[in-house]
Regions:
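Extracytoplasmic cell-surface/polysaccharide-interacting catalytic and binding patches
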Residues: 2-107, 111-204
Length: 204
């Protein structure tokens, strides 16, 4: 299994404490420290780091994974959401440590590209009702929001299988039963992914 480094910075330096840390003195508990962990991808070590919320991710050294589901913003982006990219980088490094390769084969798409893919799917599947099971139109898809990844679609499926098994740690979830390659940041890192939907036509 991959390793998660947990760090707590105290006033005097760094202590290796868990999220519910206990300080002991002469074998007696004198104080219990509780903190909400912040998930960060530490670029120098290529490891997932849990830092205390009051410290946060280190600017220039960490990529923050965010503390909740990543939702659409108010303006259309032109690239993948940075926190989604940080989540993938963190998972990718953990998978690499186990000898598994993960690749983003498709991520951000413009509205025009997404609508083109939907129209192409209609021609392939004969009706919009069938096409939408595989490709959503631009106004419904999360690809144009920079919030969806197609992982290892054109490569070894083992990378996507690894991410399905371990992605919740990084806040990444497989979404559809009929698309083993499609992942979205549906939960906070360390949460529980929702049940798979049969296909995209069941999207609410």
């Amino acid at each position: 299994m991959f390793f998660i480094t947990v760090l707590l910075m105290g006033l005097a330096g760094l202590f290796g404490l868990a999220a519910d840390a206990v300080i002991q003195k002469e074998n007696k508990v004198v104080q219990e420290i509780k903190f909400n962990p912040v998930y960060c991808f530490n670029k120098p070590s290529e490891k997932l780091i849990l830092r205390p919320e009051f410290i946060g991710c280190i600017i220039g050294e960490d990529e923050p994974l965010g503390q909740s589901e990543i939702k659409e913003g108010t303006e259309r982006p032109t690239q993948l959401h940075p926190q989604l990219l940080a989540r993938f980088h963190s998972a990718q490094a953990a998978a690499k440590a186990e000898g598994v390769t993960m690749t983003i084969d498709s991520g951000y798409r413009s509205l025009e590209t997404q609508n083109y893919l939907f129209q192409r799917a209609i021609k392939e599947h004969k009706t919009p009702e069938e096409a939408i099971k595989w490709v959503l139109p631009g106004d419904l898809s999360r690809h144009p929001w920079g919030l969806a990844l197609d992982v290892n679609l054109n490569h070894d499926k083992s990378g996507a299988s690894w991410l399905e098994a371990n992605g919740a740690t990084f806040g990444l979830c497989r979404v559809y039963e009929n698309e083993w390659w499609h992942f979205e940041p549906l939960i906070a890192p360390g949460g529980i992914c929702p049940p798979l939907m049969p296909d995209a036509s069941h999207l609410k």
